[in-house]
């Protein structure tokens, strides 16, 4: 093998080696986790909603309740129909209530705090409660189960309702 061929052969080997090394990711690049994207967050959210629903269904079965699920995920059972028209936005009501966690821990009640004075759609209440009240009439009694996304969400209320809690309301609307 002459020296010219040997140089060419070495140059080809060196070029191939250099090319293969330059195309490789560095070890630190290959192991860095990516930031969660919108799709990842949506997948996590769907998973949490499914898990919350399973827990609620288990509670309903244990308590032998005959509840209905609304399209938004609110669970409700009207125990007493009440009279008149269904409640709507801007209706003023007085409501007796008990608010508890699925494990039975009582968080709030009208016997401790007095009845709630509410203007539907305008008072500072949970989205699920606002929705549920519109399913009732004056004098009605009902049970609402609010999954976290219709209640206090990821953070809870900062007082008695922990983060990501499903809450159960027993309510009675004054006639």
Model-derived regions: residue spans:
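Sec-dependent bacterial lipoprotein signal peptides
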Residues: 1-21
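Cross-family detector of peptidyl-prolyl cis-trans isomerase
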Residues: 6, 23-175
């Amino acid at each position: 093998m002459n020296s010219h061929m040997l140089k060419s052969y070495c140059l080809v080997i060196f070029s191939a080696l250099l090319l293969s090394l330059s195309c490789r990711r560095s070890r630190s690049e290959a192991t860095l986790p990516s930031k969660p994207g919108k799709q990842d967050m949506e997948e996590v959210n769907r998973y949490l909603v499914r898990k919350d629903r399973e827990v609620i269904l288990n509670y309903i079965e244990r308590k032998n309740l005959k509840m209905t699920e609304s399209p938004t995920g609110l669970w409700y059972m009207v125990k007493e129909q009440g009279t008149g028209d269904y409640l709507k936005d801007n209706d003023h009501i007085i409501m007796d209530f008990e608010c508890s966690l699925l494990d039975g821990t009582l968080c709030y009640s009208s016997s401790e705090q007095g009845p709630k004075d509410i203007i539907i759609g305008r008072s500072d209440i949970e989205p699920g409660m606002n929705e549920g009240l519109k399913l009732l009439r004056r004098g009605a009694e009902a049970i609402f189960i609010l999954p976290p996304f219709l209640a206090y969400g990821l953070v809870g209320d900062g007082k008695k309702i922990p983060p990501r809690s499903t809450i159960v309301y027993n309510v009675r609307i004054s006639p």
